[in-house]
Amino acid sequence: MMENDIKLGTELDDRQEKDNKKLELKIDGISCQACVAKIERKLSRTDGVEKALVNISNNMADIEYDEKEIKASEIMKIIEKLGYTPKRREDLKDKEEALRAEKKLKSELTKSKIAIVLSLILMYISMSHMFGLPVPHIIYPVDHIFNYVAIQFIIAVTVMIIGKRFYKVGFRQLFMLSPNMDSLVAVGTSSAFIYSLYISYKIFADNNIHLMHSLYYESAAMIIAFVMLGKYLETLSKGKASAAIKKLVNFQAKKANIIRNGEIVEIDINEVSKGDIVFIKPGEKIPVDGRIIEGHSTIDEAMITGESIPVEKLENDKVYSGSINKDGALKVIVNATEGETLISKIAKLVEDAQMTKAPIARLADKVSLIFVPTVIFIAIFAALLWWFLIKYNVVSVNQNSFEFVLTIFISILIIACPCSLGLATPTAIMVGTGKGAELGILIKSGEALEKLNQIDTIVFDKTGTLTEGTPKVIDIVSLTNIDKDEILKIAASMEVSSEHPLGKAVYDEAKEKNINLYDVKNFLSISGRGVIGEIEAKKYLLGNKKLLLDNNIKDLHEEEIHKYELQGKTTILLADEEKLIAFITLADVVRNESLELIKKLKKENIKTYMLTGDNERTARVIAEKLGIDDVIAEVSPEDKYKKVKELQEQGKKVAMVGDGINDSPALAQADVGMAIGSGTDIAIESADIVLMGKDIETIFTAIRLSRATIKNIKENLFWAFFYNTCGIPIAGGLLYLFTGHLLNPMIAGLAMGMSSVSVVSNALRLKRFK
């Protein structure tokens, strides 16, 4: 597969049409999907802008524009006018940006901790008189009402200052007529705080201690504290998503040994040019893409192809950056340098897949565009209506008209507080992902959990996913009267120091059976062939057909061996000086749980595909054994990426399961990328979900957990809307028309609190998921 020229750039080149320029921006200030929608909508309506995609997971914008109609600077000014801060990607220094992001994350965590601690203290103080909780006498409300109110005011203001960004962003977006979740938080907490200020005034002005029950400083503080914690967790998950690309780049060697004027000179990788001759020692990482001009070796391309068995490389064969030279010195002529190598193109595909993947639209953000202005309008309208009715004596009230109208206004805003709406999705996701972690399923984001619920197609990589990923001895076939244990003893003795996966598998098999090995003399390792050695004065050869043919052993029992190869097995031949005496077959063993997983997926009408860089014969054998619906063998990383994209274009919701670097573009492109925890770090970083153990049957558990969580979210949203929408007419004075009593803001706050309690309690039911 790797011998064919892999043109990963093709997919990227096709995206550049006409004379369009591409602008990549990092946009600060994005807090939710409403922000994303606003930026995309504004840019898409701008003349000259052909495409505008904003990714909420990394706050990056991918913009294509016609330079004849609009300049990049003009696009950035449009974004600035919307209230955001765009920066060109090329202007960002990776190290400085990483340090800045890390510092910001630590700061957010510290602020969240302080806000939560202060809010809990405030809640304790505010509830002390209701439950008889002990407090210092200096703030005991009966004797020191001023101190009691003042301490609550001070703590609430402190928490609100800590969370000032919610007010800055929320009110700005509200005044620009495009409210987001920050707007909901700002309006709700401000309403509670303003009403508390009014009640504080009334307590002191009227010397009415009983009004202390109507203070809601703790509500404002607690909402801010919990939302800050949620934002921190969201930022944390966003940071992990971008680590995959950095690790892909880091797989490349930092130095290269160049032959110049007959001498070997070590230089930085960015100084290597096309046409240079690179010298690569055994065990070294290959620094560039190129062609072997001298030497032969076996190359471990597992980080590129995902296949565990090293590939034999001879003169004129191609080698790739990031792979490892196992056992022979090589001279390679460079044909692709840093930024142009296969591994660099894989990194680019991962990045592009992350950019073009549409983030799931969050219902709460969509609703907020209508919900917040509607609630504010209703509150103002209801207050004005009652003022009009009172002024013109249509109705009479038994209290000050201003206080009556203000109570109506504040009660509506408090009962319609977005706390429950804001908690509906993240609380269920938090519990769901926590439960997943308990079950060995690392779910990196709520978005992945939501998308997994929609999956109807799963694409599996073979090696290390459906199979163990390492070869194991399957059969030992003796062609003489030598028994199997003796054959294994001889072969393992020859491979005692082998680093080759096949040789190591033979040695491990003997070790597992506690077989004592022979001493081998006159040992010789021949690259691409096998090994030769003497045991008790008798010469043995262990390796492939080429080794035996080179030593004039002609009868290789090819028909018999071919039967095993048809079963997808690899053979090692053992011969003495005269003839072939035995052969050992090895194969990448299918995981025990793979068959059960495929059966369960079929029952749920989920279609399965297997993609692998392995040969067609081996792939078909494994696919038939497992009952996989379709299989595509000998595929490159680009082929896997394209197959996932092709399935998506057919309208399928695709999950990709893999464990190697070659899987990372497909993992990123898929609706949900799932990595085996024992796989490479890159696959794990590129994936949305990581199976911490080797039991891939947890894939089905993850699907069930996703379905349970989405169902829970829908229930939460129902209760959130139920409490809010049913409470608004009551808060608006409906109760007064029938009973002569207004809904006290304290009751409105209780209703708001109950809606939050119901949402959280419902989400906690996910803890019982099995």
Segments (PLM) and residue ranges:
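Conserved cytosolic catalytic loops of P-type ATPases
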Residues: D47-Y65, E69, S73, L215-Y217, ...
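P-type ATPase nucleotide-binding
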Residues: S478-E604, E616, I628-V644
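Juxtamembrane coupling segments of multi-pass membrane pumps/enzymes
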Residues: E11-L12, K18, K22-E24, E96, ...
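Membrane-embedded alpha-helical bundles of multi-pass transporters
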Residues: F131-F146, F175, I194, K435, ...
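Soluble-to-membrane junctions at the N-terminal ends of transmembrane alpha-helices
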Residues: E97-L118, V169-A192, A347-F381, I455, ...
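Transmembrane helix-loop-helix hairpins at the membrane interface
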Residues: D14, S107-K255, K366
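Flexible metal-binding regulatory segments at protein termini and peripheral loops
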Residues: M1-N147, E263-I264, S344, K348-T356, ...
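Conserved ATP-binding TGD loop and adjacent catalytic N/P-domain core of P-type ATPases
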Residues: N20, A37, N58, A537, ...
